[in-house]
Amino acid sequence: MQISTKFTIAIHLLAAIAYFSEGYRVTSEFLAGSIGTNPVIVRGVMLKLRGAGLIETKRGPGSIRLLRPLSAITFLDVYRAVETGSGKALFHFHEHPNPQCPVGRNIHRSLDGMLLDIQQRFEADLASHTVADVLNRIHACARKEASPAATSAKASEDIQAPKKG
């Protein structure tokens, strides 16, 4: 199973919208620069977030805003917005198992409950994390980068002799 980059792009977008809400014109181009992707991809993800009621967008520069506090936006909200939609199955079953085969005839009865249990645990874990958690970590990392010890360590890294190749 693999979740597409739309999920992490959406988390990045939401965190960046909040982080840069004061003093910046937050546009799809601005966000694309932060993410390192094409503005068209950003606009596609924003469309999904808007459809899920997480952001509001208006024509014109810097007219993107959060509709809920980041502490009220869970990873599950984001996942459902950009990946599956609400209430959709995580696992997709092959369409026509052979009813003449004992495995084919009984696969749904044997596997469906297990897959549902896995999905419920996955969704509960996603629901336990918020975008505010991510932004808090971003702020902590930024403070650490700005500390005198980090600046001093970075300066000493910059002046080290190059390694022999």
Predicted regions and their residues:
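C-terminal regulatory/oligomerization modules of transcriptional regulators
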Residues: 92-165
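Short amphipathic alpha-helical interface segments
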Residues: 11-22
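Basic amphipathic alpha-helical segments that dock to polyanions
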Residues: 45-50
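A short alpha-helical element within helix-turn-helix/winged-helix DNA-binding domains
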Residues: 25-36
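Beta-hairpin "wing" of winged helix-turn-helix
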Residues: 53-67
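Conserved segment of winged-helix/HTH DNA-binding domains
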Residues: 70-96, 115
